């Protein structure tokens, strides 16, 4: 059954913001949260309150000649509640679920760029046999990135618990770059745009990669990550996160050089620039506030510390290199490790709910905190500093060699990693 929820206090006042061309590239951020209990009436009230301080989500897209705008029009958002008596319980799944047929029935997906489409859709499915509640959220990427999404969901979680949101409040106005902002000294950095393909070609390549690669979800406990970090000479210069990415690249390179005489030479890194460029993206800014940077060539593509330092240097430099696709000798790092979804959106059920998202890509590392699990006594426990890395890898020998190396490293406590 679908109903509609309006802001408890209309605050949009017809305000409009203009979207950047890069905002139109993306579709929606679709997530699933599985809880042992949800009060549906209280959830609806929390959504209504949240919409009042997030009027952009109660808005609609307008097109004015060549401009795309969002008008804060205080429109209702759809809320769907259904009951499922077929599924015995929510299965034990990795954070990133590659099989869309599992997750799609539990998400009411925001449609891409139609004129009268809600920018947020929420669906709750109660599993009658286990009494679990599956909350599916679809958040238009026109609104913002993962940081924007988690900001809204954290506000929603706190309203549900009867708490006030944590400051700062969301900031919606945007600064759009113009021709007058152009810096010709950056033109040499725009070479990656030459590799950009049309949407149809990218979709075709995506389908091809889905058939020639398999998804891997690799988990690391907090103890294992600490051990990896300790192996990096000069570890004070790099973070645990840098070393984790370096380990993934080193492992792939050592196997790839044996199989195909190729290896990854660089990495693209998605970096959130909120509060780095405070004048255009302060803390709390709601937008797609990230840049995609490329590292320099790895001085030693088979060295843990060499790659980790190269990654850290690129992040620290944080210069503009916006791209659309990457080459065969490059990987992409898109990490959510900064955001612990299962702590930010717990609705008061600390370490008792699981978070899932969909889609993995070839040579594209998506990094998340581990979900809580149940111990032998059926109690929920969580390794708060553990990580899951999801990516797609070539089927056959490449995948098998990677898994073999990873499993040996885990069993030997990374004794062969250097």
Where are the predicted features?
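Acyl-CoA-dependent O-acyltransferases
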Residues: 1-68, 211-418
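Acyl-thioester-dependent condensation/acyltransferase catalytic cores
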Residues: 48-142, 146, 161
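Small-residue-rich loop/turn and linker elements
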Residues: 57-101, 165-194, 259-290
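Cytochrome P450 heme-thiolate monooxygenase catalytic domain
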Residues: 95-99, 149-155, 314
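Long, hydrophobic, well-ordered secondary-structure blocks that form the structural core
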Residues: 145, 152-163, 173-175
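Short amphipathic alpha-helical face segments that pack within enzyme cores
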Residues: 147-155, 243-248
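Short, charged low-complexity linker/loop segments at the C-terminal edge of domains
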Residues: 161-166, 398-399
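Flexible, P/S/T/G-rich "lid" or insertion loops adjacent to the active sites of thioester-utilizing
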Residues: 178-236
